[in-house]
Amino acid sequence: MLNKEVYVNRRRKLKENFKDGLILIMGNDFSPLDCEDNTYPFIQDATFRYYFGIDHNGLIGIIDIDKNEEIIFGNDYTMSDIIWMGKQKFLKELAIEVEIEKFIEKEELKKYLENRKNIRFTNQYKTDNIMYLSSILNINPFEFDKNISFDLVKAIIKQRNIKDKIEIEEIEKAVNITKEMHLSAMRNVKAGMKEYELVADVEKQPRKYNAYYSFQTILSKNGQILHNHSHLNILKDGDLVLLDCGALSDEGYCGDVYKRQLLCSIER
């Protein structure tokens, strides 16, 4: 996480846009790959992380303007979790690190929101978040987008569009890792290899920095096909190899660089 004052100031600035009501910001949960306990790598919602900083699943942030308080709702670690995962810092401790004094179990959120007016939230891209919010707010999930706060969406976009020095440094870190991904491809590409062999080398680079890739790597000799995620072709001399890739840093900032390279073997 960044310095706690960063998150305090971001929340304060967002709150200044509204005179009453409350702001609800959804974090992400795990997404199952083929069963509940086998999941895709966890990626926290960028807006939740921007204001609350915690890279953990199942959290919801509340900025309550009427009551002048800030809360994180979630399910803290149980003894069963500790047996499986080892000793962990409790989520209520992480909340304090971003200057949130109140951490409340997630099951209490619906009661907290009862009879409240001006509950502001943004559009959601994950179905489980749509269904959860629809349930606790008693709205039709098929009409979810009719209930979002466009004033909140605009305020968040306006604030997040302006990058401070700390964010620029984090973006540069992600771009530098992305640079290594491209340089590795340039050094290791050779005629006769499969595209997926080069993809494996490219995607290895961010893992060396506790990073991930910011989107599915596009690497293809058939660059005329937009967003080609197949990597089964054999590379040959004279191919124009397209690489579009990026790194997602451990602080949640991304790189995204695109290039084409002529494959030309040189005898030494």
Protein language model features and the residues they cover:
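Acidic/histidine-enriched ion/cofactor-binding microenvironments in catalytic or ligand-binding pockets
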Residues: 53-55, 64-65, 224-253, 264
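Active-site pocket-lining segments that scaffold enzyme catalytic pockets across diverse folds
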Residues: 163-187, 193-210
